[in-house]
C-alpha cells in the first residue's frame, strides 16, 4: 500500500495550534507575547488592593502568594474547563501532548516503597546501558531513593531532565549479589498514543488510541498501513477512555476516511469568528467499513472524530454516550511563566451539534458529578435511561436524526459489562492487588515467562487454576479474606485480568489488550457488525449523498 503521509491541508485556525486537553479544546499553546498579560488601561481593583496591603497592612505578606491564591478563585468562577496553570506545572502539563520528553526510557511502579522497573523502552537510554525489567532503583545521583516519601512525581522530577544530561542510578537485581551502578544519558522518549493495532480475524483490524498527541496521526497511519497489509478491510477504532488531546490529530484522522469537501468540525464564539475544518480528499481509506467505540470517558478530540464519522454517515458509533466536552480554549501566558487557558469558543460537529454538555458558571463541583449522576440514573446500563433533548434535533448528510445537548450518542448502545463483577472482585481491584500480584508473579517467574514470544505461548504457561488459587492466597495475606461463592463468580474475570497484566509486563501493550478484551461485549458487537457488512449506517431512502 502506498500510504499518503502528507498531512491534510485544512481551512482551520490559521497560525494557531488546536489542542484538546483535560480542560477542553485549547488553541494557541504558544500564543504571541503581545497577547500575554501586561498593560491594561482599565482601573485595576485587584492591583490597587495588593498595593494597599503591601503598603499599609500590619503584617508582612508575600504578594506572589496572594496572587497565586486569588487567580485560581477568579478562574474558578468561569466554566469548568478554564484553568490557571502555575509556572511550576506548565511544562509537565504541556509535555503530555508533545509526543516525546527527555528521560531515561523506563516504565516503573512504586511497590513496597521501592521503584520497580516494569519495562525498558526499546532503543531507549536505559536499554543501551543494560538496565532490565525487574530491576529496583535504590538511589539516584548518590541519594537514597527508597521509603515512604517516594512518589511518582518525585521519581519523574529526578529521572527526567534535559536531553544529553546524565543521571546516576544504583540498581538491585535478583541475579546479582551486589548493587549495580549505571550512568544513563537522558534522551528523547516517545509518548505513544496508539496502544495497540492488531487483526481480530482475516478481515477486521483493531486500533486502540489512548490519547491524541503530536505523533498520534503518524502512529495511526502506520497502524492502518500495517493492518491493511495484513488483509484488513474493516477498521474498529477504540476511543473508550480517551479524554482527548491535540485537535489536529483527530481532524487528520477523520480526513483519512472522508471524501473531499466534507465538514469535519467547526468552532465559533463571541469574539471568535467561525473557522471550519474540511476534508481535502487525500484520505486513503474512504471506502472501508469504519466503527468507532466510545464510552462515557471519550471526550474532546475523541468526540470530534466520532462526530465527524457519524454526521458524515461514514461509519457507526458503538458503545455509550460520550463525555460532552466541547469548549475551545486559548492559552495566554503570564510573564512569570504561568498561564491561563481561557474558554473563547465552542466546537460543533458537521450537523451543527454542540457537544458541550450543560454547565453553570462557578459550579465545577456539580459539573464533575455529572458522570456519577449518569451512572446512578442507569444510563450506563440501559439506553432508555439516557436523557436526550428531542428539541435539539439535527441531521446527518444523509438525513438521519441525531441529537445535541451534550456528547455523542452511539448508533448502537452497548451497556457496561458487569459479568463476573462481585464485591470480592471490587475489593481486590480497588486495593490494586491484581496489578501488584501480576508484577510480583512476573518478577518471580521472569526467566520462564520471557521464553514466550506471543500471547498463545504465554497462555500455555499461565495455567488458570494455579494462577487463581495463588492469587486468592496472596489477597488473603493482604487482608482480603477468601469468599468462595464470589470468587467462583468472578473466576474468569480475575484470571483474564491477571493474564493481561502479566502479558503487558512480558510482551507489551498490544498483548495486554488482546487478553483484556477477549470477552469484551462492545468489541464483539462491532466485530459481528463489520463481518456482516453492516458497518455503514442505515440511511433514509431520500436525499442520500454518495460516500
Stretches found by the model and what they are:
Residues 1-9:
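Short, Lys/Arg-rich N-terminal segment immediately upstream of the first membrane anchor
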Residues 12-29:
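Hydrophobic membrane-insertion alpha-helices, especially the h-region
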Residues 27-42, 46, 50-58, 62-63, ...:
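Cleft-lining beta-strand/loop regions that shape enzyme active-site pockets
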Residues 57-118, 164-196, 517-527, 535-542:
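Extended, small/polar residue-biased N-terminal targeting/export presequences
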Residues 134-136:
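Structural motif
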Residues 140-141, 172, 358, 405:
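Residue-level recognition of conserved beta-strand edge/terminus positions
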Residues 301, 313, 320, 324-392:
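Polar, glycine-rich mid-to-C-terminal structural blocks
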Residues 354-355, 359-547:
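Conserved functional hotspot residues or short segments at active or partner-binding sites
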Amino acid at each position: 500500500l502506498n500510504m499518503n503521509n502528507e498531512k491534510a491541508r485544512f481551512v482551520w485556525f490559521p497560525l494557531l495550534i488546536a489542542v484538546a486537553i483535560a480542560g477542553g479544546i485549547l488553541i494557541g499553546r504558544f500564543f504571541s507575547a503581545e497577547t500575554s498579560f501586561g498593560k491594561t488601561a482599565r482601573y485595576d481593583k485587584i492591583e490597587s488592593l495588593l498595593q494597599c496591603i503591601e503598603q499599609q497592612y500590619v503584617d508582612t505578606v508575600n504578594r506572589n502568594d496572594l496572587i497565586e491564591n486569588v487567580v485560581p478563585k477568579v478562574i474558578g468562577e468561569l466554566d469548568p474547563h478554564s484553568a490557571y496553570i502555575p509556572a511550576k506545572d506548565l511544562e509537565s502539563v504541556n509535555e503530555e501532548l508533545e509526543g516525546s520528553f527527555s528521560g531515561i526510557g523506563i516504565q516503573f511502579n512504586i511497590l513496597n516503597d521501592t521503584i520497580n522497573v516494569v519495562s525498558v523502552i526499546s532503543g531507549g537510554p536505559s536499554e543501551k546501558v543494560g538496565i532490565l525489567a525487574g530491576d529496583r532503583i535504590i538511589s539516584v545521583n548518590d541519594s537514597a531513593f527508597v521509603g515512604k516519601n517516594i512518589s511518582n512525581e518525585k521519581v519523574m522530577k529526578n529521572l527526567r531532565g534535559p536531553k544529553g544530561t546524565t543521571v546516576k542510578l544504583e540498581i538491585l537485581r535478583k541475579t546479582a549479589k551486589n548493587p549495580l551502578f549505571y550512568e544513563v544519558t537522558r534522551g528523547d522518549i516517545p509518548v505513544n498514543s496508539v496502544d495497540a493495532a492488531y487483526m481480530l480475524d482475516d478481515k477486521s483490524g483493531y486500533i486502540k488510541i489512548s490519547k491524541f498527541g503530536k505523533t498520534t496521526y503518524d502512529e495511526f497511519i502506520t497502524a492502518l498501513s500495517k493492518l491493511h497489509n495484513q488483509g484488513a478491510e474493516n477498521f474498529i477504532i477504540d476511543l473508550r477512555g480517551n479524554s482527548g488531546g491535540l485537535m489536529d490529530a483527530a481532524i487528520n484522522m477523520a480526513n483519512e476516511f472522508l471524501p473531499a469537501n466534507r465538514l469535519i468540525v467547526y468552532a465559533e464564539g463571541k469574539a471568535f469568528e467561525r473557522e471550519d475544518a474540511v476534508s481535502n480528499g487525500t484520505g486513503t481509506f474512504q471506502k472501508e467499513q469504519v466503527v468507532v467505540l466510545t464510552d462515557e470517558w471519550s471526550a474532546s478530540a475523541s468526540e470530534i472524530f466520532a462526530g465527524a464519522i457519524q454526521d458524515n454517515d461514514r461509519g457507526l458509533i458503538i458503545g455509550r454516550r460520550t463525555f460532552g466536552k466541547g469548549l475551545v480554549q486559548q492559552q495566554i501566558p503570564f510573564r512569570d511563566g504561568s498561564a491561563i487557558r481561557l474558554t473563547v469558543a465552542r466546537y460543533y460537529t458537521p450537523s451543527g451539534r454542540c457537544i458541550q454538555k450543560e454547565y453553570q458558571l462557578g459550579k465545577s463541583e456539580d459539573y464533575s458529578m455529572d458522570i456519577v449522576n449518569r451512572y446512578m440514573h442507569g444510563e450506563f446500563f440501559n439506553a432508555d435511561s439516557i436523557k436526550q433533548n428531542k428539541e435539539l434535533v439535527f441531521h446527518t448528510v444523509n438525513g438521519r436524526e441525531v441529537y445535541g445537548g451534550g456528547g455523542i450518542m452511539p448508533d448502537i448502545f452497548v451497556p457496561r459489562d458487569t459479568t463476573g463483577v462481585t464485591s470480592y472482585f471490587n475489593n481486590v481491584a480497588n486495593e490494586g492487588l491484581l496489578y501488584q500480584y501480576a508484577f510480583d508473579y512476573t518478577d518471580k517467574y521472569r526467566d520462564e515467562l520471557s521464553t514466550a514470544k506471543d500471547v498463545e505461548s504465554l497462555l500455555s504457561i499461565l495455567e488458570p487454576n494455579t494462577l487463581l488459587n495463588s492469587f486468592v492466597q496472596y489477597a488473603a495475606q493482604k487482608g482480603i479474606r477468601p469468599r468462595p461463592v464470589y470468587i467462583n463468580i468472578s473466576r474468569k474475570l480475575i484470571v483474564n485480568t491477571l493474564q493481561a497484566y502479566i502479558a503487558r509486563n512480558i510482551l507489551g501493550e498490544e498483548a495486554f489488550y488482546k487478553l483484556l478484551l477477549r470477552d469484551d461485549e462492545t468489541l464483539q458487537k462491532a466485530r459481528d457488525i463489520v463481518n456482516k457488512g453492516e458497518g455503514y449506517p442505515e440511511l433514509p431512502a431520500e436525499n442520500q449523498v454518495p460516500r
